[in-house]
């Protein structure tokens, strides 16, 4: 999801893009060698760009970490420590969104050869370490502000699977990587006049739930503006939802609201409203109309500018389109999708679409 023009208490608007990037280099055994700061060029959207770096000779594993405050990181003291010990221990506060990605080169291949010839599209996907929460009042309701309450003040930089002992995260993963420090942030005293909030992962236990207070009024009736409280519940089970990094939680108002109160303070203790529906989107978009489904493989990547022909290179974006069934099936040649530019002021106008129906 887009991350521009956002004003929130939980994430500084100046911290929503890539401000700085570090590369943690490990050998084939996963032992730390050194940290490298690449020369980078960040695009105007602050969410993509290119980088160049010289890494140690025996590097086989690289963790990419963007926007993390590393002033207290003891590089010399960490030499020889395993990646499973170093990376899961990196903790961030809510002042900036932190991005993380990892590449691992096979033991029988040189790193440069792997990046140039094997790494898919020569790109490294980066995952945000916070979740995104938005409101949609639809045609029924105008939301004039909201605030998240009872959330964690800190979060881990990278997702680490404690069961497999691997960094095997993808957008379909549902495990949490919580810090040892479960300190809660100070709850706000008023809503933020924003359409987006960012929060750290949370197990969201029933006895200590994260919740949202929002302010708004029915369409065409601004004099009826009130405050409401909503719990983040699964629509099927009515159990609290786990808050997972790099996921988008959309709170949609689907009917007339009850239990509105005149002040933010009163809303903190009022019963949750009804007629609320929450949907969860991975950062990798998936859209369905009930009959057909479109899945886009990549929306957030870092490009390697050191490759041959960087100025004239072509970028391949993969998608899957077919029937909304299990398993998904391709459509016929006559039904294949059309791909066009919506807006383009940085690339050559040519665009091609190869749809494989095999």
Where are these regions (language model features)?
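Contiguous beta-strand segments within globular domains
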Residues: 1-6, 130-134, 306-320
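Tryptophan-paired
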Residues: 6-77, 111, 132-245, 319, ...
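Acidic Ser/Thr/Pro-rich low-complexity disordered segments
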Residues: 31-35, 70-104, 159-167, 330, ...
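Short strand-edge motifs at loop-to-beta-strand transitions and within beta-strands
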Residues: 49-51, 120-122, 249, 353-355
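Extracellular and analogous surface-interaction loops
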Residues: 53-55, 123-127, 201-204, 306-310, ...
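Extracellular beta-sheet/turn segments enriched in Thr/Pro/Gly and aliphatic residues
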Residues: 84-138, 235-285
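Beta-sheet-dominated interaction scaffolds and their linkers
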Residues: 124-125, 269-318
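Surface-exposed binding patches on compact interaction domains or structured appendages
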Residues: 294-298, 310-316, 320-357
């Amino acid at each position: 999801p887009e991350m521009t023009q956002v004003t929130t208490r939980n994430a500084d608007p100046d911290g929503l893009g890539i401000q700085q990037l570090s590369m943690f280099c490990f050998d084939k055994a996963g032992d730390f060698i050194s940290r490298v700061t690449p020369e980078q060029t960040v695009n105007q959207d602050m969410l993509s760009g290119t980088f160049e770096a010289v890494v140690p000779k025996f590097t086989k594993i690289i963790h990419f970490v963007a926007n993390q405050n590393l002033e207290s990181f003891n590089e010399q003291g960490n030499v020889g420590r395993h990646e499973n010990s170093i990376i899961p221990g990196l903790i961030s506060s809510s002042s900036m969104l932190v991005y993380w990605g990892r590449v691992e080169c096979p033991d029988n291949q040189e790193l440069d050869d792997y990046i140039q010839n094997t790494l898919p599209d020569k790109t490294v996907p980066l995952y945000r370490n916070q979740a995104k929460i938005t409101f949609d009042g639809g045609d029924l309701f105008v939301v004039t502000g909201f605030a998240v309450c009872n959330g964690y003040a800190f979060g881990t930089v990278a997702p680490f699977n404690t069961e497999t002992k691997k960094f095997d995260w993808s957008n379909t993963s549902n495990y949490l990587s919580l810090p040892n420090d479960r300190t809660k942030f100070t709850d706000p005293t008023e809503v933020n006049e924003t359409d987006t909030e960012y929060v750290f992962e949370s197990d969201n236990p029933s006895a200590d739930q994260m919740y949202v207070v929002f302010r708004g009024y029915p369409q065409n009736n601004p004099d009826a503006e009130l405050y409401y409280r909503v719990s983040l519940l699964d629509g099927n089970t009515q159990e609290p939802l786990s808050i997972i990094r790099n996921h988008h939680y959309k709170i949609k108002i689907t009917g007339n609201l009850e239990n509105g109160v005149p002040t933010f303070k009163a809303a903190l203790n009022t019963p949750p409203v009804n007629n609320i529906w929450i949907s969860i989107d991975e950062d990798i978009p998936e859209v369905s109309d009930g009959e057909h489904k479109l899945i886009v493989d990549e929306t957030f990547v870092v490009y390697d500018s050191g490759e041959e022909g960087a100025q004239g290179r072509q970028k391949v974006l993969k998608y899957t389109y077919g029937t909304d069934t299990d398993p998904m099936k391709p459509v016929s040649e006559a039904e294949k999708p059309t791909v066009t530019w919506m807006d383009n002021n940085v690339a050559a106008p040519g665009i091609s679409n190869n749809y494989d129906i095999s």
